[in-house]
Amino acid sequence: QGMFGCGMLQNIFSTYINRPTVFKNKEALANTFVPNKISYREEEIRHISNILAPLLRGYQASNIFIYGTCGTGKTICSRYVVAQLEEAGKNRIKCVYINTKLKRVGDTEYRLLNRLLRELDEIMPDTGLPTDILYRRLVTAVEDRGISLVLILDEIDALFKKIGDEFIYSLTRINTELNRARIVLIGITNDLSFRDRLDQRIKSSLG
């Protein structure tokens, strides 16, 4: 048979599938992986959980600001807790993780709001809309659903460098317009001095 003939009797990937691998679970290497259990961070997990727990009863929870050196488990602990929270809250809690350092995600206020609305299954037009309209759509989306939205903003210092602090302040102020819904922010940074450089109104809103 020729190179593209029909003489093959088995799937060309069968060798790959049956070949031994050194990985027990290769998915664990992915940035999006959240383990079923985290060791040696029980106190931190308990602290985050206690802050977010009121959402399960429909109450407002405080925003959270987490900072520490790289590799200390800030992101994985936060994602672990909110995954558990989302599971416990069933359809009443929606958790969204955004690494704001990534290009075309956290480099403009519009793209961040667009991403949030898409996570809520909102149909977004291809053409741009004014950010004030996107804020109104976000308020309507969470209020109509009656959900608590937990938003993790990783590398939040990169977000401030790109678009300033008005986005965070505006998000925290949305709660004043909500009755059935809640929005909680979790900001994460490796920059230990970042919080000291924030405007006082942002400090108080982030907790």
For the regions a protein language model found, what residue spans apply to each?
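A generic secondary-structure signal
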Residues: N50-L55, Q84, T140-A141, R173-I174
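Mid-core helix/loop region of P-loop NTP-binding domains shared across ATPases and GTPases
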Residues: L9, F13-K24, A30, A61, ...
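AAA+/P-loop NTPase substrate/partner-engagement loops
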Residues: E86-L116
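Short glycine-rich or small-residue beta-strand-to-loop segments that form or flank ligand, phosphate
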Residues: F65-T69, I98-K101, D157
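A short, basic N-terminal segment
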Residues: M3-Q60
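Walker A/P-loop nucleotide-binding motif
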Residues: Y59-Y80
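Conserved beta-strand scaffold positions in the cores of enzyme catalytic domains, especially
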Residues: N63, C95-Y97, G207
